[in-house]
Amino acid sequence: MFPCLAHRPWQVLCRVYLQQRAPLSQRSSKISKPCFGWQSRGGVHKLWFSFPDFRVTSLTWTQVQNCSTSGSGKDGSPTRPEEPKTTEKAQAAQPAAKGAGSKPQGLTKAESIQVKVRAVLKKREYGLKYTQNNFITAVRAMNEFCLKPSDLEHLRKIRRRSPHDDTEAFTVFLRSDVEAKALEVWGSQEALARERDQRKEVEREYQENIFRNQKLLKEYKDFWGNTKPRSRKRATFLQGPGKVVMVAICINGLNFFFKLLAWVYTGSASMFSEAIHSLADTCNQALLALGISQSVRNPDAIHPYGFSNMRYIASLISGVGIFMMGAGLSWYHGIMGLLHPQPIESLLWAYCILAGSLVSEGATLLVAINEIKKSARTQGLSFYEYVMQSRDPSTNVVLLEDAAAVLGVVLAAGCMGLTSLTGNPYYDSLGSLGVGTLLGTVSAFLIYTNTEALLGRSIQAEHMQKLTEFLENDPAVRAIHDVKATDMGLSKVRFKAEVDFDGRVVTRSYLEKQDIEQILNEIQQVKTPEELENFMLKHGENIIDTLGAEVDRLEKELKQRNPEVRHVDLEIL
């Protein structure tokens, strides 16, 4: 703004005269207002620039008179003012200044400047910890601050949207009000802390008494008989995969008993491998039954997403058990048979038991195949896709174990037949090694598929695209980013996405529920920045609540259209 002074240090006091031009009807003498600043040594510099007059439609002229504190230049003689070049604005403003009689002698430059004043709200400093706007529920207020319901009656109550699907709104309190009430009731923070410790001790004793009473109640029911109807958990356990597992446990237990008798009678290594195979199947399927019973438990505070992964955990342990007990012992017995061959007795009973085992294992295999076909048809998958993706780990374990059992029976019968024909016991030992290899392959597949499921496997791409398109078709959504949809087991899906909402649509959704005339009247009554701030804070908070309601609406509609989606997390981008 001062090109002739930009290169000089500010060291000399300067005096500024402000002169305004009044309207023609109120033309008066000069009005001079001095102000002070610093300017460089030497010379007198005079500049003209104008400000808009907010009181009248005229220009305000300002004369800057620069005076040297010594009144001389470097050599002590008066220094003449330096005359900068005048601009077009200065040339246009000079005649007006002359007509007003306000141009002082020595004017060399005039500049017209428009100053725009910007009103800015003062920024509030909240600090590292700010809890004055935190809400707290009645249950938390009573538990954390040791208050009674009567203590909360006279506090400010605020209705907010509920985060739960079964309720639309619930009542909360300001945390600052609750803290103040707690200090009023207990007197100090130390007294409140002592009361909390006492209540924790009482709660611990209460939990111990509940556990003791539950044991007594169980003993009482066992003595007199439990007349309660069969629970939903037991009914669920006897359907679908639970039914398949229970059938497999019964059949494999009988097979183990008869194969063990045949091995004791014949001494066949292949028969020993088959007996161990049936024992491993029985133990693993009992473990699967435990996993199924635990997977249908309801979620609790420690496990908010439920226990559906217990099926995968049980199947994983089952795979490890098949490898250790089935494959390991079969290989060991086969190697010992090769190193130390033993004569084999009559194999007639062994053939009969193998034939019966083939029929029973085949029946269990058919039950597992039918159950998998039914489940795959329900989810729109092929039989192969359902098995490879391990959608139902318990049924998969039964299927693979029974398939391996049928193949193992055929392999053991073939090797025993070669031993009977040739009299060479090495064929029987090779049969034991073959059964062990078959069991090792099955266990490796089970370990791999269940590990993949426990790590968090994504759902099919077509299904994920369907969920994404449903959200993108909503008018309140601009775009969907960072979509993650994982299979939680038991046909449950967890969906997460970053949503870019259309602010105009959300705001219009809020305005459609308001009285526009009333809002217009509120706008017209705004006169000061404080009133404008209160107006924006009021409606801004309501718009944020509307945005939260839009998120809840999308989550609810997504669950209704896709029942397999149990948990939805939509993050505002």
Swiss-Prot record:
* Subcellular location, record wording: Mitochondrion membrane; Nucleus; Endoplasmic reticulum
Membrane topology label:
Multi-pass membrane protein
Q: Which SUPFAM superfamilies does the UniProt record give? A: Cation efflux protein transmembrane domain-like, Putative DNA-binding domain
Give the residue interval(s) assigned to the motif LXXLL motif.
Answer: 467-471
Which GO CC terms are listed, alphabetically?
cytoplasmic vesicle; endoplasmic reticulum; mitochondrial membrane; nucleus
Question: Region (Disordered): which ranges?
Answer: 66-108
The residue ranges crossing the membrane are: 244-264, 319-339, 347-367, 397-417, 429-449
Question: Could you say which protein family the record assigns here?
Answer: Belongs to the cation diffusion facilitator (CDF) transporter (TC 2.A.4) family. SLC30A subfamily.
Q: What name appears for this protein in its UniProt entry?
A: Proton-coupled zinc antiporter SLC30A9, mitochondrial
